[in-house]
């Protein structure tokens, strides 16, 4: 018996690993292997042809089924209260968003509902959404604040996010997005809101250990380039990496600014230009594509996928779960849309929810690949080929889900 396997607490025999290793072609597929876990990490990956018994006490034969890294949803807004279904109905009837917003709808309706909700209520609502992601193979999820827009309510959202990671079998990375919108209290003085973010909210979130990163919605209906830089400088003072909602509706040059700050990722990017692409390529910043928002908003301008590909910018894919522009709680659907709407290949979509998604969260040394030494977050699927994960939607193909070496689903 292989010595490394004998030291493992659990062994999965006869898995066909799609390793997603960058040094291997496409999905990084290997012949059937034994995968052993020790102390929450992948401790051994041994070809079945090299094995001889006896096996460790805790093993199971997966009969050649496909194994992949756990899926990573690296951009979500899944903590919120209230519903925007009525707004959706009005928009389908042709009512402009500006009119809906004037009547109290839009993002500020979500802000009011989220402020009014207790931590327990927000936890219950968000847990239901996360459980849907868990069922389709998500093992790590990023969750943003941004619907509180006061010091206490932003911290409330981040506390809920931390609780979700403690209570449910999923890794949670938190992002402070106080610069999501200007709250009504600061409507006539948005610069003062930016000062509040920089001088009060970022310090409080950092000192409480509630934020893993800081994000800004840099857009003509959001925050200017100068305001974004101000928030990034404050984040940098507290050692927090930055991210950005960039170039979704127009091109303000936010991606180049974010790249100058060594951002983990910039997201949306429908209006990204060549200068921005080169800045991302130069600094190795991840471009996160959000096809569900593109679909839901009926956008027509596509992100420059071919140019990103040519420049070797790493592309991630995420669900962007939120009540206003992407009420679609499915990373698998986002993978499909990334292929059908944006022109990614199924390989690129899979890399986008594993290896590159891990990089978008600063977790590329621990997550996103099947290799010895990585955290033991992996999935076993009842499907013939990894492309099925982007192709076939709505069918439960998940056989085994492992997080930190602990099995949380076995069919």
From Swiss-Prot:
GO molecular function, one term: zinc ion binding
EC number(s) reported in the record: 3.5.2.7
Catalyzed reaction equations: 4-imidazolone-5-propanoate + H2O = N-formimidoyl-L-glutamate
Single GO biological process annotation from the record: L-histidine catabolic process to glutamate and formamide
Residues that, per the record, bind Fe(3+): 75, 77, 245, 320
Protein family membership: Belongs to the metallo-dependent hydrolases superfamily. HutI family.
NCBIfam families referenced in this protein's UniProt entry, alphabetically: hutI
Name of the protein: Imidazolonepropionase
Lineage: Bacteria, Pseudomonadati, Pseudomonadota, Gammaproteobacteria, Aeromonadales
Gene name tied to this protein: hutI
């Amino acid at each position: 018996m292989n010595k490394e396997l004998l030291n493992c607490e659990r062994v999965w025999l006869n898995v066909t690993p799609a390793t997603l290793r960058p040094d291997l072609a496409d999905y990084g597929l290997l012949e059937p292997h034994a995968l052993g876990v020790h102390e929450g990490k992948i401790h051994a990956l041994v070809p079945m042809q090299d094995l001889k018994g006896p096996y460790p006490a805790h093993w199971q034969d997966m009969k050649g089924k496909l194994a992949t890294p756990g899926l990573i949803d690296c951009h979500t807004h899944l903590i919120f209260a209230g519903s925007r279904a009525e707004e959706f109905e009005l928009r389908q009837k042709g009512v402009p968003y500006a009119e809906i917003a004037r009547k109290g709808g839009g993002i500020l309706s979500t802000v009011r509902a989220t402020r009014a909700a207790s931590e327990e209520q927000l936890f219950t609502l968000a847990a239901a959404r996360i459980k849907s992601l868990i069922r389709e193979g998500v093992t790590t999820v990023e969750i943003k604040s941004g619907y509180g827009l006061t010091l206490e309510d932003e911290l409330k959202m981040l506390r809920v996010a931390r609780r979700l990671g403690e209570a449910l079998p999923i890794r949670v990375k938190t992002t402070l997005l106080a610069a999501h919108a200007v709250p009504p209290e600061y409507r006539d003085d948005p610069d003062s809101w930016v000062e509040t973010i920089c001088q009060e909210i970022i310090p409080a979130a950092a000192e409480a250990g509630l934020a893993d990163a800081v994000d800004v919605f840099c857009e003509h209906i959001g925050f200017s380039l100068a305001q974004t830089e101000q928030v990034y400088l404050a984040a940098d003072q507290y050692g927090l990496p930055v991210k950005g909602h960039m170039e979704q509706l127009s091109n303000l040059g936010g991606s180049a600014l974010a790249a100058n700050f060594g951002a983990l990722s910039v997201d949306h990017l429908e209006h990204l230009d060549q200068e921005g692409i080169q800045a991302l390529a130069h600094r190795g910043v991840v471009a996160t594509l959000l096809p569900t928002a593109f679909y839901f908003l009926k956008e027509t301008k596509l992100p420059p996928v071919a140019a990103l590909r040519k420049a070797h910018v790493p592309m991630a894919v995420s669900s962007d779960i939120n009540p206003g522009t992407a009420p679609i709680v499915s990373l698998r659907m986002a993978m499909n849309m990334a292929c059908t709407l944006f022109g990614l290949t199924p390989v690129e979509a899979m890399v986008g929810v594993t290896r590159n998604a891990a990089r978008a969260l600063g977790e590329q040394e621990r997550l996103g690949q099947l290799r010895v030494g990585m955290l033991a977050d992996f999935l076993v699927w009842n499907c013939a080929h990894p492309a099925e994960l982007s192709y076939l939607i709505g069918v439960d193909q998940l056989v085994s889900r492992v997080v930190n070496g602990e099995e949380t689903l076995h069919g």
